[in-house]
Curated annotation (Swiss-Prot):
<dbReference type="InterPro" id="IPR002649">
    <property type="entry name" value="tRNA_m1G_MeTrfase_TrmD"/>
</dbReference>
<comment type="subunit">
    <text>Homodimer.</text>
</comment>
<feature type="binding site">
    <location>
        <position position="120"/>
    </location>
    <ligand>
        <name>S-adenosyl-L-methionine</name>
    </ligand>
</feature>
<feature type="binding site">
    <location>
        <begin position="140"/>
        <end position="145"/>
    </location>
    <ligand>
        <name>S-adenosyl-L-methionine</name>
    </ligand>
</feature>
<dbReference type="Pfam" id="PF01746">
    <property type="entry name" value="tRNA_m1G_MT"/>
</dbReference>
<dbReference type="InterPro" id="IPR016009">
    <property type="entry name" value="tRNA_MeTrfase_TRMD/TRM10"/>
</dbReference>
<keyword id="KW-0949">S-adenosyl-L-methionine</keyword>
<dbReference type="GO" id="GO:0005829">
    <property type="term" value="C:cytosol"/>
</dbReference>
<dbReference type="InterPro" id="IPR029026">
    <property type="entry name" value="tRNA_m1G_MTases_N"/>
</dbReference>
<comment type="function">
    <text>Specifically methylates guanosine-37 in various tRNAs.</text>
</comment>
<dbReference type="GO" id="GO:0002939">
    <property type="term" value="P:tRNA N1-guanine methylation"/>
</dbReference>
<comment type="similarity">
    <text>Belongs to the RNA methyltransferase TrmD family.</text>
</comment>
<dbReference type="GO" id="GO:0052906">
    <property type="term" value="F:tRNA (guanine(37)-N1)-methyltransferase activity"/>
</dbReference>
<protein>
    <recommendedName>
        <fullName>tRNA (guanine-N(1)-)-methyltransferase</fullName>
        <ecNumber>2.1.1.228</ecNumber>
    </recommendedName>
</protein>
<keyword id="KW-0489">Methyltransferase</keyword>
<dbReference type="InterPro" id="IPR023148">
    <property type="entry name" value="tRNA_m1G_MeTrfase_C_sf"/>
</dbReference>
<keyword id="KW-0808">Transferase</keyword>
């Protein structure tokens, strides 16, 4: 396994390979990610895949071998685009057949030098370039999007907020859903009562130990009810830590 490059000036460097570079930075140009981008805390560039196509029509796709609907992105074109930015950063392909994106993988990416992200289109990408360039296939959910650009934006937003100096309150990032293995507890703020619903008394008691206990109990309840898969993994990890 080759060593990953050092972060340039401590910055996370994302290169997005796409047929629609005008979609970037998009939402990544506003809020936390946009401010961090403007301040140089991370770097974003796009690569137009079509620039690496040959011939008068600059075709980036062709019909699927063996027949079938749709078109497939060509291995030679995609490979040239990938090779143009290959510097040792992980190469990711956003695809519904990929491994589900997890907070653990997001943290690992945030700790690295960056990522090269290929946005798929049409029926997919020729399998040979996936194998030949060792692309890591990542999915953001069990549903189909028009292309990988939206998925790439989701991934980068999740990564950027974990970069040093991006979030004003480090604790915020450490207590959110998935960081503890649990979904997040409920939140409340003023007014004290709204439409007959009051803030739970415990949250205004000033007893921080009791508040922490309440929040954990609520997080456990919500996770158990809504995400049995996460709850099972959480319980398994607790048993492992407890040596049971």
């Amino acid at each position: 396994m080759t060593d990953l490059p050092e972060k340039e000036g401590g910055r996370f460097h994302a290169s997005v390979l796409t047929l629609y570079p005008e979609m970037f930075p998009g939402p990544l140009g506003i809020s936390l990610a946009g401010k961090a981008l403007a301040e140089g805390k991370w770097q974003l560039d796009t690569v137009q895949i079509r620039d690496f196509a040959e011939g008068r029509h600059r075709m980036v796709d062709d019909t699927p071998s063996g027949g079938g609907a749709g078109m497939v992105m060509k291995a030679d074109v995609v490979a040239r685009a990938l090779d143009s930015v290959d510097d040792g950063r992980p190469m990711l392909l956003m695809t519904p057949r990929g491994k589900p994106l997890t907070q653990e993988r997001v943290r690992a990416l945030a700790d690295g030098a960056g990522a090269i992200i290929l946005c798929g289109h049409f029926e997919g990408v020729d399998e040979r370039v996936i194998e030949g360039r060792n692309l890591e296939e990542i999915s953001i959910g069990d549903y189909i999007l028009s292309g990988g650009e939206t998925a790439a934006i989701v991934l980068l937003d999740a990564v950027v907020r974990l970069l040093p100096g991006v979030m004003g309150n480090r604790e915020s990032g450490e207590t959110e859903s998935f960081e503890t293995g649990l979904l997040e507890h409920p939140h409340y703020t003023r007014p004290q009562e709204w439409e007959g619903r009051a803030i739970p008394d415990i949250l205004t008691s000033g007893n921080h130990g009791a508040i922490d206990k309440w929040r954990l109990e609520q997080a456990e309840r919500i996770t158990r009810e809504r995400r049995p898969d996460l709850w099972e993994a959480y319980c398994k990890n607790r048993r492992k830590i407890g040596g049971q």
